[in-house]
């Protein structure tokens, strides 16, 4: 049976997410995917430059030294750190760790994730700079 009744469709503006700080932060966090795509493309070009020999690699390094690219890469780093922070804050909510019949709070998990990140960063920098 068909009906001629028209369903109510609530109007939604394109700026709905600007009304609440929670939604603005959510859109910012989801927007961190754009700098991640930039870095991925930059990394792929770097790998191809490395594959194509010393002159190509020197051109890629010159490209990376451009002040505009340095600023874009700093923005990308900030976006990656924001994404990491929010991801680490989400991790304790997904894992129920019970110690002595009590649920562990989020602080030890978040601090241990940051500690692992710092250690991994130091190891990678040591290998890259001194190996």
UniProtKB/Swiss-Prot annotation:
Location in or out of the cell: Cell inner membrane
Topology of the protein relative to the lipid bilayer: Multi-pass membrane protein
Domain of life per record: Bacteria
A single GO cellular-component term on record: plasma membrane
Ranges annotated as spanning the membrane: 30-50, 63-83, 109-129
CDD domains assigned: QFR_TypeD_subunitC
UniProt keyword list: Cell inner membrane, Cell membrane, Membrane, Transmembrane, Transmembrane helix
Chief localisation class: membrane
UniProt GO molecular function: succinate dehydrogenase activity
Membrane listed as a keyword: yes
Function: Two distinct, membrane-bound, FAD-containing enzymes are responsible for the catalysis of fumarate and succinate interconversion; fumarate reductase is used in anaerobic growth, and succinate dehydrogenase is used in aerobic growth. Anchors the catalytic components of the fumarate reductase complex to the cell inner membrane, binds quinones.
Family of this protein: Belongs to the FrdC family.
Quaternary structure and partners: Part of an enzyme complex containing four subunits: a flavoprotein (FrdA), an iron-sulfur protein (FrdB), and two hydrophobic anchor proteins (FrdC and FrdD).
Protein name as it appears in the record: Fumarate reductase subunit C
């Amino acid at each position: 049976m068909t009906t001629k009744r028209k369903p109510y469709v609530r109007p939604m503006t394109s700026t709905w997410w600007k009304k609440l700080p929670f939604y603005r932060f959510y859109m910012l966090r989801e927007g961190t995917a754009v700098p991640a795509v930039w870095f991925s493309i930059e990394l792929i070009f770097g790998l191809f430059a490395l594959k194509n020999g010393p002159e190509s690699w020197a051109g890629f390094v010159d490209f990376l030294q451009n002040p505009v690219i340095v600023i874009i890469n700093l923005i990308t780093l900030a976006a990656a750190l924001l994404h990491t922070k929010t991801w680490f804050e989400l991790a304790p909510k997904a894992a129920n760790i019970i110690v002595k019949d009590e649920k562990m709070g989020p602080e030890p998990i978040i601090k241990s994730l940051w500690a692992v990140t710092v250690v991994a960063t130091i190891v990678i920098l040591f290998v890259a700079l001194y190996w």
